[in-house]
Amino acid sequence: MKALALLAVLLLSGCASIYSTPPTAIHQPMSARPDMRAQAVPATGSIYQPSQARPLFEDRRARNVGDIITINLVERNTAQKSANASATRGSAITGGISLTAPNIASLANAKLNGLQADVGLDSDFSGEGAAAANNVFNGTISVTVIDVYPNGNLLVSGEKMVAINQGNEFIRFSGVINPTTVTAANTVQSTQVADARIEYRGSGFIDESNTMGWLQRFFVAIAPF
C-alpha cells in the first residue's frame, strides 16, 4: 500500500505544470492604480485648474503614481577575475642506532648492528582559478510609477511577458528615477536609474531542461567529493 502511495505521488509530480511564473527578486507591485484626483472646483474661466496641474511650457511627463515611463535598457557589464595559489612544505627526520645483543647469540640473526631509521614528508599544493563575464541587455520596457518619494524621486516597476512557442519569457524592471532625467519623450536610460533590478527569466520545458532535478540536487549536496 505504501509503495502504491509513493508511486501515485511521483506520477502526480510528473503531471505538474512547468509553465508557472518564475520567481522574482522584486518584492513591490508590478503596477499601481493612480491616486484619486482632487475634486474639481467650479470653472472660473481661469486657464489654471488645481485638480489638473501641469506646467504650461513642458511636455507631459510621468510625475504621479500610476503614470507610465518607458525605460531604454542599455546594460553592458564586463568583469574579470583570476587567482593563483601555491604552497610547498617538506620535512625529514634521520636517526641511527647501533645495537649488539650477545645474550641471545643462539638465535639466528639476533645480532642487531647499525639499526637506522629515516622518515621524510613532502607536501605540495598548487591552485589556479579564473572567471570572466560579459553581459549585454538591450531593449525597452514601460513601467508604472509605484510611489513618489518626498524629494520627488519616482519608484517604478513593471513587467513584460512574451509567449513564444512552448514557453513564456518574462522581463521585469524596478528602480528609482530622478524626474530630471526623464526626456521630453517620457523615456529614461536604464543606466540613470538608481537601485535598478533587471530580470530576464523564462518558464517552460526549455527552461526546465536547464535546471537540475530535485533528486540530483540532493545527491550533489551530500556527496563528499
UniProtKB/Swiss-Prot annotation:
This is Flagellar L-ring protein. GO terms for molecular function: cytoskeletal motor activity. HAMAP family: FlgH (MF_00415). Belongs to the FlgH family. The basal body constitutes a major portion of the flagellar organelle and consists of four rings (L,P,S, and M) mounted on a central rod. A lipid is attached at residue 15 (N-palmitoyl cysteine). Residues 1-14 form the signal peptide. The gene is flgH. Keywords: Bacterial flagellum, Cell outer membrane, Lipoprotein, Membrane, Palmitate, Signal. One of its GO terms (biological process) is bacterial-type flagellum-dependent cell motility. GO terms for cellular component: bacterial-type flagellum basal body, distal rod, L ring; cell outer membrane. It is found in: Cell outer membrane; Bacterial flagellum basal body. A lipid is attached at residue 15 (S-diacylglycerol cysteine). It is a lipid-anchor. Its main location: membrane. It comes from Azoarcus sp. (strain BH72). Assembles around the rod to form the L-ring and probably protects the motor/basal body from shearing forces during rotation.
